[in-house]
């Protein structure tokens, strides 16, 4: 009798530890929402792309980002291409 009680207890404990008994509710951390993305500074923003209309006033890293993401590349004296 004691053996049966012990085995039932161990089996129920194993199920609780594996999470088989409680299938609903909070089981893992809630993922953090993505950070707010601000438009690049340096002039008016083009429609829906987040890159400035003009190449003036933007940093090298901003220009490189617009070029690699959207194909809008700044050229010296010419402005955007693409």
Curated annotation (Swiss-Prot):
It comes from Penaeus vannamei. Disulfide bonds join 51-66, 55-73, 67-74. Antibacterial and antifungal activity. Presents chitin-binding activity. Pfam families: Penaeidin. Coiled coil: none annotated. Its main location: cytoplasm. Belongs to the penaeidin family. GO terms for cellular component: cytoplasm. This is Penaeidin-3d.
